[in-house]
Amino acid sequence: MTADVNNLIWIDLEMTGLEPDVDRIIEIATLVTDQELNIIGQGPVIAIHQSDDVLAAMDDWNQKHHGESGLIDRVRASQETEAQAVAKTIAFLEQYVPKGASPMCGNSIGQDRRFLNRYMRELEDYFHYRNVDVSTIKELVKRWSPETMAGFKKQNTHQALQDIQESIAELQYYRSKVFKI
């Protein structure tokens, strides 16, 4: 596969909480689409090992959701470090998109970028500084065309790969219903 500057990198992180100064990344997944939002590559889905102390410090919401999804058990069993996850993810991305070409794509991607900046700077640097944040479009559609919102329902599994797949599907929906292109 030849790397293409028009391809888009989609990323999702699962974290122990919302504060990068305190919380940690526990899962990362990436997908690459072409410019028409067709998935052309799936990167590694990596549970990142964190200590029992880090996991025990999670609030009730994170304990519940990451426990029910099996992610906490996967994190405990994982031997993967943040540095290893970065190296594997970049090795995947290099096949599809040159460094600095793709905006960071996903839902509420500003939060992911904050954690990448703190714990995975080399990966954060792989992206263009711009974002394609599907949640921005969702917020506008909710205000400008609320009836359109009923046509797309997310599963909200809080599992990184499924969340990215839903983000892409959501943008495809908005493209066809709102942008009509």
Swiss-Prot record:
What are the GO cellular component annotations?
A: cytoplasm
Cellular localization per UniProt: Cytoplasm
> Out of the domains of life, which is the source?
Bacteria
Q: Which CDD domains match?
A: Orn
Record-annotated Exonuclease domain positions: 8-171
Q: Does the keyword Cytoplasm apply?
A: yes
Q: List keywords of the entry alphabetically.
A: Cytoplasm, Exonuclease, Hydrolase, Nuclease
Q: Does the keyword Hydrolase apply?
A: yes
Q: Which family does it belong to?
A: Belongs to the oligoribonuclease family.
Q: Which PANTHER family match?
A: OLIGORIBONUCLEASE, MITOCHONDRIAL
Function per UniProt? 3'-to-5' exoribonuclease specific for small oligoribonucleotides.
Q: What is this protein called?
A: Oligoribonuclease
Which organism encodes this protein?
A: Shewanella baltica (strain OS155 / ATCC BAA-1091)
Lineage, broadest ranks: Bacteria, Pseudomonadati, Pseudomonadota, Gammaproteobacteria, Alteromonadales
